[in-house]
Amino acid sequence: MITRSIGIARRSNSINCIVGSNTSTSYSLDESTKRWISTSTKQPMSLIPTASSLVASSPPNLKPYLQLMRVDKPIGTWLLYWPCTWSIAMATPAGQLPSIYMLSLFGAGAFLMRSAGCVINDLWDKDFDKKVERTKLRPLACGSLTEKQAIGLLAGLLSSSLAILLQLNWYSVAVGASSMALVVGYPLAKRFTYWPQFVLGLTFNWGALLGWCALKGDLSSSAPFWMYAAALQWTLIYDTIYAHQDKADDIMIGVKSTALRLGADTKKWLSAFGVGTVASLTACGIASDQTWPYYVALAATTAQLGWQVGTVDIDNGSDCWDKFKSNSWMGIILFSGIVASTLLKEVFQILIRPYH
């Protein structure tokens, strides 16, 4: 949600900035706007606008706020959302589809909290961002928004998130509120440890616990904890891949990351994290009595992770970005498998009932 390293908060080439917007009438086009204009002149305009095109065409007074929230880079919201959907689908009663209401609540919450995390990140990092070519045009770094404006936006995002959280049971409210220390403190981790991606994993996958207790009312089962462990290791994979784009900048400004810590041994570590992810998801499936579609989906996600780790070029920023974005496919594959597995649970229960 939150991070310079999650691609989300650090991929700032596309940030449009009106430098000194309060005192100047000089405007500059950002890279995403240029690409959008270029693309739209060469191809028929899509009937469905993309997130980046919506931000690029937004009113000038609104655009810096949308950019600060990373609305033009929705991959961060998806990566926050998928563990929530896994948990909700897994906690759904046998033979039923997951609640659209719950999925919608968590979808809105994922968008709001990821946006809030990006604001928090930029408030902490604005002085770093001014020194880096790719980040110096972020709204806070370049001055198109003030700290006061960012804090006002943050207050609105957190208030809206709280309103959504209060729709859940009180156990879930307590679980959700307990994540705030991680949300606020995560951006500081990269100043003190080479493992900020681990802290990100703890923070970013809280929905794996919250989705379960939103339906079940407690965390008495081991299943959500296995899912949380799997999602944490998954984050270590995709965010380490992403962090390799920024190695030179990180060294220059003194920011730490797993990309710098693991270096040439990155693929060995990513392979180990991949094994841990699959093992944890297997344990989660056993603990929650999943049926065969879950394990088919798990095999597909294993292949997807293997492809990522096996083919990523950690010295090629473009390839790292492509592999990073591909993780949304893993999210939807696993979600689909859990939904199908839950629908079949009732059939399996009927079939085995005569033998008990």
Swiss-Prot record:
Gene3D superfamilies: UbiA prenyltransferase (1.20.120.1780). GO terms for cellular component: mitochondrial inner membrane; mitochondrial membrane. Residues 1-44 form a transit peptide. Pathway: Cofactor biosynthesis; ubiquinone biosynthesis. It is an enzyme of class 2 (transferase). It holds the Pfam family UbiA. The keyword Transmembrane applies. Its cofactor is Mg(2+). CDD domains: PT_UbiA_COQ2 (cd13959). It comes from the Eukaryota. One of its GO terms (molecular function) is 4-hydroxybenzoate polyprenyltransferase activity. Its main location: mitochondrion. Its EC number is 2.5.1.39. It catalyses: an all-trans-polyprenyl diphosphate + 4-hydroxybenzoate = a 4-hydroxy-3-(all-trans-polyprenyl)benzoate + diphosphate. It is found in: Mitochondrion inner membrane. It is a multi-pass membrane protein. One of its GO terms (biological process) is isoprenoid biosynthetic process. The chain crosses the membrane at residues 71-91, 93-113, 150-170, 195-215, 269-289, 332-352. Keywords: Isoprene biosynthesis, Membrane, Mitochondrion, Mitochondrion inner membrane, Transferase, Transit peptide, Transmembrane, Transmembrane helix, Ubiquinone biosynthesis. Catalyzes the prenylation of para-hydroxybenzoate (PHB) with an all-trans polyprenyl group. Mediates the second step in the final reaction sequence of coenzyme Q (CoQ) biosynthesis, which is the condensation of the polyisoprenoid side chain with PHB, generating the first membrane-bound Q intermediate. Belongs to the UbiA prenyltransferase family. This is 4-hydroxybenzoate polyprenyltransferase, mitochondrial. It comes from Caenorhabditis elegans.
